[in-house]
Amino acid sequence: MAYVTSTQLYNWRFTQDELANQRQECNAAVRRRLSAQYRAKAEVKGGDVPAEPTFLTAEEEFIIVKRYIFAMKELFHQFSDSGLPVDVFGFAATYLKRFYLNNSVMDYFPREMMLTALYLACKAADYPLGLQTFAAHIPRNREHYSEIVVHSELFLMEKLQYDIWIHTPYRPLSGLLVDLLAYRKTQLGEPMTIEAGEVATADMMTSLKKEGYEIIHKWFQTDLCLTHSPSQFALAVLLELGQKHPDLGVEKFVKNSVCEYNSSDELMEQKWTALNEKMEQIQTMIGEFEFLSDLTYGSDLEAVLMQCRNPLYDPLSEEYAAAKEQAEKLMSFLD
């Protein structure tokens, strides 16, 4: 299925304002519900009512989700022995982004949803791993998280409206790099170089793909997968590579080959202007974004989350144990 006819475009493409509004509305609704839940529990217990926990803001929730996308990238690299394709990370990161548009980290703990998203992504990207193989790459509490993943997979699919096929920017970037190297060789007659000197075309392709894919991995911390098409995402990454390696002549390639720019064609001039504006928007977003480079950032928010998370979904809480016991009694009655 092409992107232009996909659910990704029709169901999961937003403006920055729409994303901000959805997150604010979701956060406000959860805060109201958890606050009411807390007061009701305090009234039942009676006596002195302890202070209500501090709840996370929408902005703080975004930081936590960003933190777990970074953690997911680190975990993804642990699967090198399984040969997971890069699309798996793109699928999983997009799932997590979509899920937390309409759901809160205060309800559904991000570590659990991150693992579930990664496991589901393996299947959706046509590279299924057995649960034992998957769990073997989880650093700790493997049995606990295996159970969580099994019980959360269908729930995640439902929350994603079963839109689990993702068009990622990896393949478009690959195609652009192939065209770039062909353009340099046939049109410009330039040697294949990257600063250090002449490099074989295949080696250069491998090097640029690796570098470009790492940029894509990093940029999944932003909302690019929700605000722009995969091809625009990929083109922005190519331009980023061009800034890192000026000798590649990326801008000339984009203008002359990708866009086939002709200044005498008014329609072409308009398209070129529109594309430049799109790329400038992305570059501004990337330039202003605060990327995570290690997991120490946001650890204070994680501590707040542990205090304010919904006890009904916390396996260690009394409320969760009571709800589980009630569900088991109901199931035994049905048997």
UniProtKB/Swiss-Prot annotation:
One of its GO terms (biological process) is regulation of transcription by RNA polymerase II. GO terms for molecular function: cyclin-dependent protein serine/threonine kinase regulator activity. CDD domains: CYCLIN_CCNH_rpt1 (cd20524), CYCLIN_CCNH_rpt2 (cd20525). The keyword Zinc does not apply. Its main location: nucleus. SUPFAM superfamilies: Cyclin-like. Keywords: Cell cycle, Cyclin, Nucleus. GO terms for cellular component: nucleus. It comes from the Eukaryota. It is found in: Nucleus. The keyword Lipid metabolism does not apply. Regulates CDK7, the catalytic subunit of the CDK-activating kinase (CAK) enzymatic complex. PANTHER family: CYCLIN. Belongs to the cyclin family. Cyclin C subfamily. This is Probable cyclin-H. The gene is CYCH.
